[in-house]
């Protein structure tokens, strides 16, 4: 017999480590951009499982690919070759504009691998070349080294000394970065658009200036595209807006369409920094994950979603700006790119998220007062209008 909502919540809280702040809602079913809870209530989802469900829920191509691969071969380890991994590698290389790929399981793993490669690259040049510079308000994961690279004091408290060799500077401030750059820096790690920090888009020239500083000091430029990648911003990857190509690019979230898969990509010149045995993982790039990657990326391409995201994102942003004009004392900024949008409010964002949920719309609050909107890439204009109407109602009431 199916468990009721109360039982599910109580049993989850009994067994799961208490590391998540959850809403009292039990997800049961998803289709397109809609989800249903276990009491039959329907919601328009403008959060996509934290920017993960790029094709929405229950996309037939993705479901078919995973189902067929599961019936064929789920796992065999990377000690052997598989055809589906080759297919996935090809489409990731094409989408990222890179040559060599490493598959992992989550964004933090991808970022760990990228920093590890950068450290080995740097130390091969000089034993003191191991510093990694990242940005205040950044988020790169909750594993121990990604924690040190993450620019939020909140995540650092209670763990004693963090991993050494990490330096934080203000995001978008080239002078602050320049003051910390020297020949002991092996890498600069940045999000092309900050996600958890509040959907911050840097000044247009900033990434070009960072690239120049990295080149001057022979430091690798790492772009964390875990949240910004896979058509989310109206380009395959956000770096393509600026034309500044990183030396290492990390990916996760949307690349599996909901299946846990991540990794990093490098150009050919960095392909042999790692030697056999230097890096690896049991599950990364398993056949099931690769089937999800191949289905997701080929569907984004065949359905023309990159251009559609750019178009719908502009429409969405304009609608949010209309709300800003309507509530100038409550909405202080609207920013973002494609379908990665942030609406900054004057007060706390949590009541707005809760009001939207009561009106059957799912959005998120990050950085305390930024309503973050990262819907499935397939969201329709009609569904955008539903989200905007719920935000309008929430703003009117707060």
Label the predicted regions:
Residues 2-398:
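Conserved N-terminal phosphate-binding loop of PLP-dependent enzymes in the Aspartate aminotransferase
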């Amino acid at each position: 017999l199916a468990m009721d909502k109360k039982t599910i919540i109580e049993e989850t809280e009994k067994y799961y480590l208490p590391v998540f702040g959850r809403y009292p809602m039990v997800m049961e079913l998803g289709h397109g951009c809609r989800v249903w809870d276990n009491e039959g209530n329907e919601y328009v989802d403008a959060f996509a499982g934290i920017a993960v469900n790029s094709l929405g829920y229950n996309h037939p191509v993705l479901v078919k690919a995973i189902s067929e691969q599961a019936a064929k071969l789920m796992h065999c380890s990377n000690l052997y070759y598989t055809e589906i991994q080759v297919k996935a590698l090809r489409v990731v290389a094409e989408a990222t504009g890179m040559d060599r790929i490493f598959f992992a399981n989550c964004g933090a793993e991808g970022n760990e691998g990228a920093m590890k490669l950068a450290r080995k690259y740097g130390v091969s040049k000089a034993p003191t070349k191991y510093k990694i510079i990242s940005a205040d308000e950044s988020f790169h994961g909750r594993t121990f080294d990604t924690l040190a690279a993450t620019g939020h004091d909140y995540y650092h408290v209670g763990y004693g000394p963090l991993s050494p060799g990490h330096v934080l500077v203000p995001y978008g401030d080239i002078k602050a970065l320049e003051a910390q750059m020297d020949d002991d820096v092996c890498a600069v790690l940045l999000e092309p658009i900050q996600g958890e920090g509040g959907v911050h888009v840097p000044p247009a020239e900033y990434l070009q200036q960072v690239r120049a500083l990295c080149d001057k000091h022979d430091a690798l430029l790492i772009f964390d595209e875990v949240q910004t990648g896979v058509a989310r911003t109206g380009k395959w990857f956000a770096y393509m807006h600026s034309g500044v190509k990183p030396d290492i690019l990390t990916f996760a979230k949307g690349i599996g369409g909901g299946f846990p898969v991540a990794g990093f990509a490098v150009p050919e010149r960095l392909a042999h920094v790692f030697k056999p045995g230097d890096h690896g993982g049991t599950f990364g790039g398993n056949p099931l994950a690769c089937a999800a990657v191949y289905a997701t990326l080929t569907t984004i391409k065949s359905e023309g979603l990159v251009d559609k995201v750019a178009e719908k994102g502009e429409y969405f942003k304009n609608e949010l700006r209309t709300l800003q004009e309507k509530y100038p004392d409550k909405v202080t900024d609207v920013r973002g790119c494609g379908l990665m949008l942030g609406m900054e409010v004057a007060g706390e964002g949590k009541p707005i998220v809760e009001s939207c949920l009561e009106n059957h719309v799912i959005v998120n609050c990050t950085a305390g007062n930024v309503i973050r909107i990262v819907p499935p890439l397939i969201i329709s204009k009609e569904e955008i209008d539903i989200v905007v109407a719920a935000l309008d109602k929430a703003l009117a009431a707060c």
